Curated annotation (Swiss-Prot):
Belongs to the UPF0754 family. One of its GO terms (cellular component) is plasma membrane. Keywords: Cell membrane, Membrane, Transmembrane, Transmembrane helix. Its main location: membrane. It is found in: Cell membrane. The chain crosses the membrane at residues 1-21, 357-377. It is a multi-pass membrane protein. This is UPF0754 membrane protein RBAM_010020.
């Protein structure tokens, strides 16, 4: 073989060895996928580097994600950024507009959300809630005087109403006894009174007559009812009774007048008057559109700020509880090596080819140097 042939042969051999070596090294990153054994001993370099170090790689990737990529500070910064807020507000605005155009009733909307029998549940909740609150208030104030827990302003207004109540009672009484019904009632009362007196009553009836006595009593009765002293007397009596009532505890009031039963009876009447059915039959769009401006302009931004602030405040604790490093490790462990190889090669295919060609180039240069030494020496 001539000098040129030797020179060319060694360059080709060196280039082939360099290219094959680099290509083999790239393949050995992933392959073989499992270890091979010969005569009971594991063949060296099996499995490939990545399959062999898979557990360590998964652990390190988990730590890298939690310590350097998905850090609490980075997520907080993203959450509180104007971009996220604007996107969230845009979504809220679009959702509100969609709901404002909805033809569904409130009942249908709740049913679509999986909430069945909302009216019955609401009525039951209101009844239960008011019972609990009334019982709680009764236990809290049952041994305290009424005047101690009534607001001062309310007490002052009630105190001012006592004389007016006296005037109202006397006026209504006067109007009643001036009416035909009142006159008849007064006559019957006088008749019953005289009958209860036996012979004396019979004698009075015989001499005066029932109608004559009623006609004589009525003007005096009306005169008494219109008298200022009567009004003052009644106002004083009502004030005294009101003062006594204010000094009662709820327990004492309950003992005397069944105040607790009266309270719960009033509650039942109030709830019976509270009709929830019309609300659930309303069109959802009518309710939303009525407050659309306030929802998108006021409530949504405030709720968003509060929600993002709360999430940011508890984010570090949430991430610790999630243990993202374990999640990443589990996902990497479950990820097929074949798919990982395909993904890496598809991304770096050109670079790996260049590495192979570089190996061939370096091998060819080394072969040329070796040929030069062989020829010269």
């Amino acid at each position: 073989m001539g000098i040129a042939g030797t020179f060319l042969f060694m360059i080709v051999i060196g280039a082939a060895i360099g290219a094959v070596t680099n290509h083999l090294a790239i393949q050995m990153l992933f392959r073989p996928y499992r270890p091979y054994y010969l005569f009971g001993k594991r063949v060296p370099f099996t499995p490939g580097l990545i399959p062999k170090r898979r557990d360590e790689l998964a652990k390190q990737m988990g730590l890298m994600v939690t310590n350097h990529l998905l850090t609490p500070e980075g997520i907080k910064k993203r959450l509180l950024s104007d971009t996220v807020k604007n996107q969230a507000l845009l979504f809220a605005e679009q959702f509100t507009q969609k709901m404002a155009a909805s033809e569904m009733t409130v009942h249908e909307a709740l049913a679509a959300a999986g909430i069945l029998n909302p009216q019955e549940k609401t009525d039951a909740w209101i009844d239960r809630f008011t019972d609990e609150k009334l019982s709680e208030l009764y236990r809290k104030y049952e041994h305290r005087a009424i005047k101690d827990w009534l607001p001062d302003e309310l007490q002052e207004k009630l105190d001012e109403k006592v004389p007016l109540a006296a005037d109202y009672i006397l006026k209504r009484s006067t109007d009643y006894f001036e009416s035909e019904e009142g006159k008849d009632r007064l006559g019957n009362m006088i008749d019953d009174f005289l009958n209860s007196r036996g012979m004396l009553g019979s004698m009075v009836q015989m001499f005066l007559g029932n109608s004559s006595l009623a006609d004589r009593v009525l003007p005096e009765l009306l005169k008494f009812l219109r008298n200022e002293e009567t009004k003052k007397l009644l106002a004083d009596l009502l004030s005294q009774e009101w003062g006594k009532l204010k000094s009662y505890t709820l327990y004492e009031a309950d003992e005397k007048w069944n105040a607790k039963d009266l309270l719960f009876s009033m509650k039942k009447r109030a709830l019976a008057a509270l009709q929830t059915a019309p609300f659930f039959e309303c069109r959802l769009g009518d309710i939303i559109s009525r407050y659309e401006g306030e929802i998108t302009g006021t409530y949504a931004p405030k709720l968003l700020d509060a929600a993002l602030g709360s999430i940011a405040a508890h984010l570090e604790d949430v991430l610790k509880r999630l243990r993202l490093e374990e999640v990443v490790k589990e996902q990497v462990d479950q990820f097929p090596v074949e798919r990982l190889e395909e993904m890496v090669l598809s991304i770096s295919k050109r670079e790996f080819k260049m590495i192979t060609y570089l190996g061939g180039l370096l091998g060819g240069i080394i072969g040329a140097i070796q040929a030069l030494f062989v020829i010269l020496f």
